[in-house]
């Protein structure tokens, strides 16, 4: 059973994939999107779902620190609903508070350069989100 993890931003979607046992998450890629033009990366996500035989998708839900959901969280919920309807798969929302900060700390501790961090931060945030979900099971 493979699970896809997504960190949805305004310009990119970070993508992570679980191993076949559903124990560990690995960064896969970063998909460029354009919300204003209605390009959300659904075609590429659909390709990945087919390629890896994905059973479930976990989408990060950016909550405010007080637990409320703001405009970005609402946009992620709509993204998840669109994915659910398009792919007919289970899509789970997962609290992603501080996932980007955690990813940044991981990359800094691994001595990754600032330039390289900028290129992989969304993918790493997706790993943090997906690994959090996997660890909860």
From Swiss-Prot:
The keyword Endoplasmic reticulum does not apply. Its main location: cytoplasm. Gene3D superfamilies: YqgF/RNase H-like domain. It is found in: Cytoplasm. Keywords: Cytoplasm, Hydrolase, Nuclease, Ribosome biogenesis. GO terms for cellular component: cytosol. Its EC number is 3.1.-.-. The keyword Oxidoreductase does not apply. CDD domains: YqgF (cd16964). InterPro entries: RNaseH-like_sf, YqgF, YqgF/RNaseH-like_dom, YqgF/RNaseH-like_dom_sf. One of its GO terms (molecular function) is nuclease activity. GO terms for biological process: rRNA 5'-end processing. NCBIfam families: RNAse_H_YqgF. PANTHER family: POLYNUCLEOTIDYL TRANSFERASE, RIBONUCLEASE H-LIKE SUPERFAMILY PROTEIN. Belongs to the YqgF nuclease family. Could be a nuclease involved in processing of the 5'-end of pre-16S rRNA. This is Putative pre-16S rRNA nuclease.
